[in-house]
Each structure stands twice: as structure tokens, then as C-alpha cells.
Swiss-Prot record:
CDD domains: RecA-like_HslU. ATP binds at residues 21, 63-68, 276, 341, 413. The keyword Nucleotide-binding applies. This is ATP-dependent protease ATPase subunit HslU. It is found in: Cytoplasm. Keywords: ATP-binding, Chaperone, Cytoplasm, Nucleotide-binding, Stress response. GO terms for molecular function: ATP binding; ATP hydrolysis activity; peptidase activity; proteasome-activating activity. One of its GO terms (biological process) is protein unfolding. NCBIfam families: hslU (TIGR00390), PRK05201.1 (NF003544). ATPase subunit of a proteasome-like degradation complex; this subunit has chaperone activity. The binding of ATP and its subsequent hydrolysis by HslU are essential for unfolding of protein substrates subsequently hydrolyzed by HslV. HslU recognizes the N-terminal part of its protein substrates and unfolds these before they are guided to HslV for hydrolysis. Its main location: cytoplasm. A double ring-shaped homohexamer of HslV is capped on each side by a ring-shaped HslU homohexamer. The assembly of the HslU/HslV complex is dependent on binding of ATP. The keyword ATP-binding applies.
Length: 463
């Protein structure tokens, strides 16, 4: 398979098609946007500074694939990705989260992403070090028989020095190799050992009120290097010790300065921030009440989207080349209700169409992570073969679409509630049913949902 940087916009859309049904225009827009970033990397330095990403505004009802398109794109490109709700933020001066925190969160995600990649590279070495530490606990050297040599040396060293004969050392090595063999064969997984772990005392957490969590984390990180690291002995099984020690040993092998440098570069040049519910901060604000800082949030958001420098605990981060994708249903407000400067920062606008009954049929069947495939995989662990007929799938799609028309339109999310209700009985009885092949047809779907769908009040609560 091609690396992401070699993929054409058409190929990116084809990859997104594996997970998201329809919405071609939105897929096309994001594919062009990320491809332009790759093109920008190939430009000479003077041109690279001039080319800024074209941010995208997605307009469409809930459950049509806005978030999923952005999330899958980030996974595909290996970009640091952060999803935030615009309603989470408040204007500077009000209690709540400032918009700057989204950049700090993105950098944190980027650092963790690069760190995990580097840990994977040194995993083999780390496993060898973990094996040695477990063997140290299983066969401590102190258990070898000491030989008293010079009493004057013992007097000076407080009796702590132990001398071993060559025979003792040979016996110790043989015992250690014997235990190594058993360890590699998995014979000692349930053996209990005592290992020493470092713990940093954190006296600052928990003293900061709501909206000040960031400050608490920053102060804790600032003092973490100065705080004493306490060593604590813990008893655990070998299998558990391996899980605990592996990340600790791997971290010792990686250069954190290089990790941070690469993570900052990745966040600045490849980062994607998805701002959901942007329509909720659009419109005229009131002088009092919960909407008092709507326009203030937009004004605070403006410099970040335009391009500014935000200080993080890892260093300054420029936001000029971060791709921002904003999304909203815009049922009550319109994109023109956003402040003009912010509108200008989202030049690419795509409208996602509401899902039809036929789209629902495709969503149930086609994506690689399709709902019915998920249930088939889950129940196969109990030895149950779940078979969906074409008319059964169409009946589920029809009922979900009908409920969306009658009740609140929640898009494809309605399919999850319908599928869950249809398969509730099978999921409950799966381990005990004698007939391990279950066929879900239209009749079966109607039988499971008939009463609920007919009762308006009941369907409003259950589906």
C-alpha cells in the first residue's frame, strides 16, 4: 500500500469511502486540503511560508458523517487530531476553558503519538531489559551463599560486602538461565514477585477549582523535575510486572528532546482540529445569561485560526499551518451569523446532505466497520453465526429512517439504537441457545420492534 504522502486526492476519497457512505463533496474538500499540505512541504522555503491551509466549514444535520470524515482522515494521514465542542469554551475573563487550551491539548496528543511510535521502535530492547528485571526479582543475587573473607573488610563496610566463590557464581548463572527458559516458555506468568518502582509525589493536584485544571497541570509539570522520586516496592504477578515495566524501560531508551521536537513539528504542520457545534456560538448574543460570551469566544478563536503563537509546556507552537475543520447543523443560525472575520477564515464550505433510506441500507452493509459486521464479530465469540437477509437489512433501515422523520433526526446514530433493540434478545441468550445459526429477516425485525414503533411515546424513549 502507498504511503499517505504519495496518495492522490482521488485515492484519499476512495479510502474514506471504506468507512463513510456518500457525502462526496465533503470528502473531496478534505482530500484536497490535506493534499495541499503535502504539496506545500515540497515548495521552496520562501513559498512555503506564504501558502496557508484553507480551513473548512461543514454544514449538515447531526449523524451524517461530519466528525467521522475528519477522524478517519486524521487516522489515514497519521496526523495529530483533536475534536472539541465550541460550546466548551468561554471568553477570556469568564469561568471555563479558554480557546488556547485546544492547542495545548493538540500538542499533548502529538507528543503521545510520537512517543508511542518511538517506544515501538525500541520495544525489543525494552523487552530484554524487562526480562532482566524480572529475573533479578525471581533469582536475587543476594541468595547466593556468601563466603566470609577478611574480617577487617567486613568491619569497615559494616558487613555489607559479600564475596562469592567461582562455584557460587556458576550456580547462580545456571539457576538464572534455568529461570529464563521457564520465563520464555510462559511457565512463571502467575509467579508473584516484588519489584521496585519510582513514584513522583504530586502535591499540587486537586487544589485548583473548575476551569483551572490547565493551571494545575502546568504547575505540576513545572515542579515534577524538582520533586523527589520515591521508590516503592510492589508485589505483583510476573504477567502484570511485564505490563508495568515495559513502558518504563522503553521510556529510558528514547530521547524525549527529539520526541518533543518531532511532536511540535507534527502538530504545527500536520495537526487537524475539528471544532464541532460552531453554530451554537453564532448569532446575536444576549447581555446576560448563558450566551453572554458567544461573540467573545469567536473573537478569541479568530487569532488562533488566523495564525498566532501559543505557549505550551513543550515550547511555543505556531498555529498558522494547523488545519481547522469547523462543523455545525445551522438549524437556528446561519454561517453568516458568525462574525465576518471568522467567516473569512473558513473559505471552503461544504454542505452534507441528510441521509436517505437507501443510505441507511448502505451504512448497514458497506463500510469496513459496518454495524451488522460488528455484531457478527461479537456474537461469533460465543459460537453464534448471525445471518442478515437483504429484506431484514432493508426493514431495519426503513424503521430507522421512519423514526428519524417522526422523532428527532439523529442521522445514522438511529441505526445503532434500532440494531441494539433488534439483537437484544440474541445478545442476552447467545451463550445458552442450542441453535447456533440465527437468521435476522424482515419478519424477525418487525416482531422485535412492532410494539415500540407503533407506540409514539415508547419509541421516543427507547429508540
Amino acid at each position: 500500500m502507498k504511503s499517505f504522502d504519495e496518495m492522490t486526492p482521488k485515492e484519499i476519497v476512495q479510502e474514506l469511502d471504506k468507512y463513510i457512505v456518500g457525502q462526496y463533496e465533503a470528502k473531496k474538500a478534505v482530500a484536497i486540503a490535506v493534499r495541499n499540505r503535502i504539496r506545500r512541504q515540497k515548495l521552496p522555503e520562501e513559498w512555503r511560508k506564504e501558502v496557508l491551509p484553507k480551513n473548512i466549514l461543514m454544514i449538515g444535520p447531526t449523524g451524517v458523517g461530519k466528525t467521522e470524515i475528519a477522524r478517519r482522515l486524521a487516522q489515514l494521514s497519521g496526523s495529530p487530531f483533536l475534536k472539541v465542542e465550541a460550546t466548551r469554551f468561554t471568553e477570556v475573563g469568564y469561568v471555563g476553558k479558554n480557546v488556547d487550551s485546544m492547542i495545548r491539548d493538540l500538542v499533548e496528543i502529538s507528543v503521545n503519538m510520537v512517543k508511542q511510535e518511538k517506544i515501538k521502535e525500541v520495544e525489543r530492547q525494552a523487552e530484554e531489559l524487562v526480562e532482566e528485571r524480572i529475573l533479578d526479582a525471581l533469582v536475587p543475587e543476594s541468595k547466593a551463599v556468601p563466603v566470609v573473607t577478611n574480617p577487617f573488610i567486613n568491619l569497615i563496610t559494616g558487613g555489607q560486602q559479600q564475596q562469592y566463590t567461582p562455584e557460587d557464581r556458576r550456580r547462580f548463572r545456571a539457576k538464572r538461565e534455568e529461570m529464563r527458559e521457564k520465563l520464555r516458555k510462559g511457565e512463571l506468568e502467575n509467579e508473584e514477585i516484588e519489584i521496585e518502582l519510582e513514584e513522583t509525589v504530586s502535591p499540587f493536584m486537586g487544589i485548583f477549582g473548575p476551569g483551572m485544571e490547565d493551571l494545575g497541570i502546568e504547575i505540576t509539570n513545572m515542579f515534577s523535575g524538582m520533586l523527589p522520586k520515591q521508590k516503592k516496592k510492589r508485589k505483583m504477578k510476573v504477567s502484570e510486572a511485564r505490563k508495568v515495566l515495559l513502558p518504563l524501560e522503553a521510556e529510558k531508551l528514547i530521547d524525549m528532546d527529539k520526541v518533543v521536537q518531532e511532536a511540535l513539528d507534527r502538530a504545527q504542520n500536520r495537526g487537524i482540529i475539528f471544532i464541532d457545534e460552531i453554530d451554537k456560538i453564532a448569532g446575536k448574543e444576549s447581555a446576560v445569561g448563558p450566551d453572554v460570551s458567544r461573540q467573545g469566544v469567536q473573537r478569541d478563536l479568530l487569532p488562533i485560526v488566523e495564525g498566532t503563537t501559543i505557549m505550551t509546556k513543550y515550547g511555543p507552537v505556531r498555529t498558522d499551518y494547523i488545519l481547522f475543520i469547523a462543523a455545525g447543523a445551522f438549524h437556528v443560525s446561519r454561517p453568516s451569523d458568525l462574525i465576518p472575520e471568522l467567516q473569512g477564515r473558513f473559505p471552503i464550505r461544504v454542505e452534507l446532505s441528510p441521509l436517505t433510506e437507501e443510505d441507511f441500507v448502505r451504512i448497514l452493509k458497506e463500510p469496513e466497520n459496518a454495524i451488522i459486521k460488528q455484531y457478527q464479530a461479537l456474537l461469533s465469540t460465543e459460537g453464534v453465526e448471525l445471518v442478515f437477509t437483504e429484506d431484514g437489512i432493508r426493514e431495519m433501515a426503513r424503521i430507522a429512517y421512519q423514526l428519524n422523520q417522526r422523532l428527532e433526526n439523529i442521522g445514522a446514530r438511529r441505526l445503532y439504537t434500532v440494531a441494539e433493540k433488534v439483537l437484544e434478545e440474541i445478545s442476552f441468550e447467545a451463550p445458552d441457545i442450542p441453535e447456533k445459526r440465527v437468521v435476522v429477516d424482515a419478519e424477525y425485525v418487525r416482531r422485535r420492534l412492532e410494539k415500540i414503533v407503533q407506540d409514539e411515546d415508547l419509541s421516543a424513549y427507547i429508540l
